[in-house]
């Protein structure tokens, strides 16, 4: 097979192979020899470091391309299963997979355009990682892009494939995909807090009254989402429906700039819902200027038809329809496109155009701000236009159960910033437990946006639910705001290190067959492992359950303080108050310590949750200006490290906080640290130095509910390093853990809807704690407990650290 090597390419008769990396090939075939070097919708960068490969002619004239990880054999002619195949090497270098052109790809899936009207699961598109050890992305039909315009390919029959042969090295596959398809942009910090959204006829007065009620209840919100009733919806019949609208309803919002400023004064940004499909009709405020600009007949009330392919319309679309409202205070747009995939240009999805042009326009005239939209997924490459709106889900346990998997799997195609209708959108029945579990999932999702449809009974205000549901949902919404320093660091890592916030289990642990079965378990950033509960509580035990895999190591439940030994499967049981969110021993988790208000800027008071028991580290990332493009000089980095040693019955741990590196203006002039020493109940020794100066430490209370001792550190200016050294008794710690176990079991029994005598018999088994083996105690508990769910919870508690 004759092929000419040019750099990283092999070109021959009607074909071109490009070796992007030793594991990533581009395969092109065009009878017209029309090969694409420019950008497409999916691909924006094919410039990779040089990769080592060999091209040779085989004994039967076939072309053979070899890298360290794969071997391609091509016999010439139009690609087919007979003439093109690739052998893929496993991680150990042995041939372990074979692909023929046209073979069905069984990847670990990617994501879908929308969850509109879905009750439960739906089929997902393909991703770039696979248990087959390879995957293929087809870029043949995507549009080409140049100088802000989209074009069809010269040869519409050309084949343009990307072959990913990364074995189980899923992280590298994802990083190279981002290199190829563009990095995930940085999000504004406020987006990582809470969003209030509801399809409901609000007025300026009623909306602000609600925001003030949230403030009185100490429920923080950072984003106000105004659904379609902000604009005129009741229009004369001759104009059609009222779904499309760009004129404020002055009966409801008489002074829009005043309303938007009032939201800003409350610490909230604002997005408006738009359905742009009907263009601009004669009743719109912007019609005269836009109609004159477009040259349509105003006397006949000729509409300005929606056509993003028309460059002039596109200019006016933003100039007359959006920019004036942005000047009044609208921050970004919720693009609610539901009119299909026909744009008038074959292969070009109008949703893609809307996402692209809206995102780019939202950056500002000089591209100085971070672009932002809320819109549906439009295919591979959509990660460049965050944030994703997953659509109008059905309110059901089935929908909730699908969402963790749906969110995590989207990372397999780089789509890391989904925003779901938390609590569900429509239909369904009221279920306070379902609402609460959905809020808990939302707090540990990329974006936390409560939403519901236009139904007077379907609101997501916490006080509309039972007392327990109200209390729990409020606490979780407050926690979401507290998580912003951690989430903003993950935002930085998603952009700079190409690591999405949410990752399935199989990214962090060497995959084995059963690992893929834990579909609803995922990593939430670098430090937390989440296993949300997506089923209703058992009526006897009052507990929800999730089956989870715990990777090797010792894990601590963020909410309960329970310690769990990894390397095994567990059934985890939790009351409505919490879900399993686990941190490994040694984890350092930074939280915003402010208890009131909507502000999410870099906090003066920071809580550090230090999970005792192992070495660990964390680097906090903060910036000053939130520039659109990453500028390292604008960022500040604070390093935290924990060193753990144990000797002679004493445990010693040393926490180091490094001097701030980078832009000191990204932090407050002084910062206070409130430490939660998780897994520590009392101290035998304590010392603190800032630089070379020894300072006092304020020892606070011990919080049994999270098994944490509180310490308050003096104000810190970031210029000197902090060294905190503390010691505790291993014997006392073991005694405390037994006490915590007894209390945990007592609460399980106290809650259970079983006879008092049965509770007493079960609790009597604990008299032998510390005397008999856990296996013997478990056997006794098992024989005395009639409830399967309660038995499971007791087994979890008693075997938490291994039997």
Language model regions located:
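Catalytic and substrate-binding clefts that recognize carbohydrates or anionic sugar/phosphate headgroups
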Residues: 9, 19, 32-34, 51-191, ...
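Aromatic- and carboxylate-enriched substrate-binding clefts and catalytic-loop regions
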Residues: 86-87, 95-100, 220-473, 506-512, ...
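Beta-sheet entry/capping signal
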Residues: 16, 24, 64, 71, ...
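Mature N-terminal, pre-catalytic/accessory segment of carbohydrate-active enzymes
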Residues: 1-36, 55-74, 79-81, 91-94, ...
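A surface-exposed beta-strand-loop module
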Residues: 61-63, 70-71, 699-723
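Catalytic core of carbohydrate-active enzymes
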Residues: 359, 380-388, 402-406, 410-420, ...
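Extracellular/luminal recognition modules and glycoprotein regions
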Residues: 1-42, 47-49, 499-507, 513-521, ...
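Solvent-exposed beta-strand/loop surfaces of large extracellular or lumenal domains
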Residues: 39-53, 294-297, 556-576, 687-712
């Amino acid at each position: 097979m004759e092929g000419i090597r040019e750099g990283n390419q092999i070109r021959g008769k009607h074909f071109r192979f490009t070796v992007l990396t030793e594991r990533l090939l581009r395969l092109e075939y065009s009878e017209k020899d029309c090969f694409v070097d420019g950008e497409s919708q999916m691909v924006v960068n094919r410039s990779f470091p040089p990769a080592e490969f060999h091209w040779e002619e085989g004994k039967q004239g076939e072309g053979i391309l070899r890298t360290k990880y794969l071997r391609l054999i091509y016999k010439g002619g139009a690609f087919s299963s007979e003439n093109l195949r690739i052998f893929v090497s496993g991680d150990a270098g042995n041939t372990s997979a074979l692909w023929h052109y046209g073979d069905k790809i069984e990847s670990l899936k990617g994501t879908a355009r929308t969850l509109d009207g879905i009750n439960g699961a739906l089929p997902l598109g393909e991703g770039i990682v696979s248990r087959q050890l390879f995957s293929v992305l087809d870029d043949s039909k995507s549009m080409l892009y140049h100088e802000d315009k989209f074009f069809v390919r010269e040869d519409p029959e050309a084949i343009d494939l990307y072959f990913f042969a990364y074995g189980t090295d899923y992280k590298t596959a994802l990083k190279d995909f981002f290199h190829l398809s563009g990095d995930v942009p940085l999000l504004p910090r406020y987006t990582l807090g809470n969003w209030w959204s509801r399809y409901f006829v609000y007025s300026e007065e009623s909306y602000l009254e609600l925001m003030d009620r949230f403030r009185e209840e100490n429920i923080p919100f950072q984003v106000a989402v105004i659904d379609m009733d902000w604009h005129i919806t009741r229009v004369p019949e001759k104009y059609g429906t009222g779904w499309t609208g760009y004129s404020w309803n002055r009966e409801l919002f008489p002074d829009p700039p005043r309303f938007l400023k009032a939201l800003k004064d409350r610490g909230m940004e604002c997005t408006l819902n738009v359905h742009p499909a009907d263009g601009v009709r004669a009743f719109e405020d912007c019609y005269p200027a836009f109609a004159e600009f477009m040259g349509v007949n105003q006397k006949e009330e000729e509409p300005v038809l929606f056509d993003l392919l028309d460059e002039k319309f596109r200019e006016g679309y933003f100039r007359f329809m959006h920019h004036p409202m942005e000047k009044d205070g609208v921050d970004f747009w919720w693009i609610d496109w539901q009119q299909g995939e026909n744009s008038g240009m074959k292969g070009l999805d109008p949703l893609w155009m809307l996402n692209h042009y809206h995102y780019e326009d939202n950056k500002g005239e000089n591209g100085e701000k971070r672009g932002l939209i809320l819109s549906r997924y439009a295919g591979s490459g959509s990660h460049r236009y965050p944030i994703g709106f997953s659509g109008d889900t059905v309110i059901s346990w089935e929908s909730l159960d699908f969402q963790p998997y749906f969110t995590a799997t989207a990372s397999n195609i780089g789509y890391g910033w989904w925003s779901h209708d938390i609590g569900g959108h429509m239909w369904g029945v009221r279920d306070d437990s379902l609402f609460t579990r959905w809020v808990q999932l939302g707090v540990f999702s990329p974006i936390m946006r409560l939403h519901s449809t236009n139904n007077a009974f379907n609101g997501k205000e916490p006080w509309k639910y039972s007392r327990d549901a109200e209390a729990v949902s409020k606490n979780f919404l407050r926690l979401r705001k507290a998580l912003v320093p951690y989430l903003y660091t993950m935002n930085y890592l998603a952009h700079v290190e190409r690591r999405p916030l949410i990752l399935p289990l199989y990214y962090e642990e060497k995959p084995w067959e059963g690992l893929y079965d834990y579909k609803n378990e995922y990593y939430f950033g670098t430090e937390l492992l989440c296993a949300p509960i997506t089923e209703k509580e058992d009526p006897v035990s009052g507990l929800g359950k999730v089956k989870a895999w715990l990777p090797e190591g010792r894990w601590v439940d963020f909410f309960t303080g329970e310690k769990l030994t990894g390397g095994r499967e567990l059934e985890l049981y939790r009351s409505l108050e919490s879900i399993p969110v686990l941190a490994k021993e040694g984890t350092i988790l930074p939280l915003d310590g402010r208890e009131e208000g909507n502000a999410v800027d870099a906090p003066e008071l920071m809580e550090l949750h230090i999970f005792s028991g192992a070495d660990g580290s964390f680097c906090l990332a903060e910036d000053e200006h939130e520039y659109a493009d990453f500028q390292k000089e604008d960022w500040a980095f604070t390093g935290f490290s924990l060193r753990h040693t144990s000797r002679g019955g004493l445990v010693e741990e040393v926490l180091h906080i490094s001097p701030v590196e980078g832009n000191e203006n990204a932090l407050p002039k002084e910062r206070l640290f409130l430490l939660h020493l998780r897994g520590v109940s009392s101290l035998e020794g304590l010392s603190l130095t800032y630089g070379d100066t020894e300072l006092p430490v304020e020892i606070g209370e011990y919080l049994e509910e999270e098994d944490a001792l509180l310490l308050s550190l003096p104000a810190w200016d970031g210029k000197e390093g902090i060294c905190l050294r503390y010691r505790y008794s291993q014997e006392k710690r073991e005694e405390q853990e037994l006490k915590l176990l007894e209390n945990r079991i007592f609460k399980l029994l106290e809650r259970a809807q079983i006879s008092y005598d049965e509770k007493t018999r079960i609790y009597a088994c604990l008299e032998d704690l510390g005397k008999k083996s856990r296996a013997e105690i478990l056997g006794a508990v098992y024989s005395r407990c009639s409830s399967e769910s309660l038995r499971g919870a007791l087994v979890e508690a008693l075997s938490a650290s291994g039997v």
